[in-house]
């Protein structure tokens, strides 16, 4: 994942770090990757590049296209240059959509990658990315092994002209690979009656405690 400012402390504290050269037009760029422990002990690689990711905001920058193309190039280098072969690559929205085609293309010359599957998740079809000449969403819909959305109903809706945002024909073509997975949360883990991470536990009998939690956050 890109190491935005919110992840700098974790990156600096990481015990495992390595450098990787990422080819760009006209020159290569060196990035530092730190492996940290994520939720449940899952290792997470943080890609540090202050020029592209050391911003106040995660999204909404004028050069977002270049930023996330660079991130995709970094992932490609990790796949081809490092001793790392995932079973599945999960892509989200236009930011990592180009990797669906890249993975399929790389598999022709790299047998190790032929068994790597891609899952592309669409959160909102209206967000197609900043470059109208390169429709990354279309590429990912066409090349991904599986396509998921945020709910079964939304998966049905985007097959229609009304909600398909011009991609309904392509989505219909690939509807056998399309599935809606309902957004949700772990009610046991995030139960406000027992959650140790909030200042004041509450349930339906004392909902007013929520206001005290808001004050504690301030």
Where are these predicted regions, by residue range?
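Catalytic cores of nucleotide-sugar-dependent glycosyltransferases that transfer UDP/GDP/TDP-activated
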Residues: 1-218
């Amino acid at each position: 994942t890109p190491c935005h400012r919110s992840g700098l402390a974790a990156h600096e504290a990481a015990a495992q770090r390595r450098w990787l050269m990422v080819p760009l037009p006209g020159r290569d760029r060196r990035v530092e990757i730190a492996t940290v422990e994520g939720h449940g002990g899952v290792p997470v690689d943080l890609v540090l590049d202050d020029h592209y990711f050391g911003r106040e905001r995660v999204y909404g920058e004028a050069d977002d296209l270049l930023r996330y193309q660079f991130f995709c190039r970094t992932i490609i280098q990790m796949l081809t240059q490092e001793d790392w072969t995932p079973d599945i690559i999960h892509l989200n929205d236009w930011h990592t959509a180009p990797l669906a085609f890249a993975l399929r293309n790389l598999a022709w010359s790299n047998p190790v990658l032929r068994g790597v599957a891609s899952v592309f998740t669409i959160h909102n079809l209206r967000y197609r990315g900043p470059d109208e000449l390169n429709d990354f969403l279309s590429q990912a819909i066409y090349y991904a092994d599986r396509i998921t959305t945020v709910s079964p109903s939304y998966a049905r809706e985007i097959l229609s002209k009304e909600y398909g945002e011009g991609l309904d024909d392509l989505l219909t073509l690939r509807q056998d690979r399309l599935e809606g997975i309902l957004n949700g949360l772990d009610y046991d883990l995030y139960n406000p009656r027992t959650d140790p991470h909030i200042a004041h536990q509450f349930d339906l009998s004392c909902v007013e405690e929520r206001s005290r939690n808001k004050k504690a956050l301030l």
